[in-house]
Swiss-Prot record:
Taxonomy of the source species: Bacteria, Bacillati, Bacillota, Bacilli, Bacillales
UniProt-listed InterPro entries: G_CP_dom, NA-bd_OB-fold, P-loop_NTPase, Ribosome_biogen_GTPase_RsgA, RsgA_GTPase_dom, RsgA_N
Protein location: Cytoplasm
Keywords: Cytoplasm, GTP-binding, Hydrolase, Metal-binding, Nucleotide-binding, Ribosome biogenesis, RNA-binding, rRNA-binding, Zinc
Residues annotated for GTP binding in this entry: 112-115, 164-172
Name used for this protein in its record: Small ribosomal subunit biogenesis GTPase RsgA
Amino acid sequence: MKTGRIVKSISGVYQVDVNGERFNTKPRGLFRKKKFSPVVGDIVEFDVQNINEGYIHQVYERKNELKRPPVSNIDTLVIVMSAVEPNFSTQLLDRFLVIAHSYQLNARILVTKKDKTPIEKQFEINELLKIYENIGYETEFIGNDDDRKKIVEAWSAGLIVLSGQSGVGKSTFLNHYRPELNLETNDISKSLNRGKHTTRHVELFERQNGYIADTPGFSALDFDHIDKDEIKDYFLELNRYGETCKFRNCNHIKEPNCNVKHQLEIGNIAQFRYDHYLQLFNEISNRKVRY
């Protein structure tokens, strides 16, 4: 038996990496009976006849899992936003962050296309990133000339997953980091101001101290797994300041003696972050129940 990590999955064939050697495997029928499917990122135990024929016998317990796209055992989710084409959006960024925290993922922020961004817009984005840094996020704002290899190798060890909407430059970033990958890229649609999907599946690529993965771009975010009363926990500063609210289950909206509302009034919480919290709270509150 061998133990390795699934690095690629296409049409029911799972490519497993063991110390740089890759094996094509399939899951045993036991998984189908249990209605359980391995995903990229899983640590698995498998037997092999040769590099093109192996069978997965066991999937080890996942420490976390992103559902869309399915990836497990993520150490850091890098949320990739572009400064322009498509334009930087704090609302979209906050929604990505909520998704990340709902799956117990450590998140950091990467903004691309600095070289295509007017100076005034660069200043505006830098000021916004300072707000996120004060909340506790690590951020980068990069252009075409920045050394991707230096950036990636400075990130923490383990599995790094790049995630973001289509057209923000995830595949371009990886091509600069590892030119031999030659990943397909595409410009954004001029009419829709969003990118076309060029990455169609998740694949892990080796890096000095772990793996890095590109993921298919998002066209929509799914919050079906999140309850309205959980959302405040996924806005880190609201969660932190909310610990001293009068009521333990305070949602920071109309409740009396709310420390979050107090911190908002004195400027310790950014108004746009609170507004995005309210928007998402109301959106999920008004969500139709699915049967």
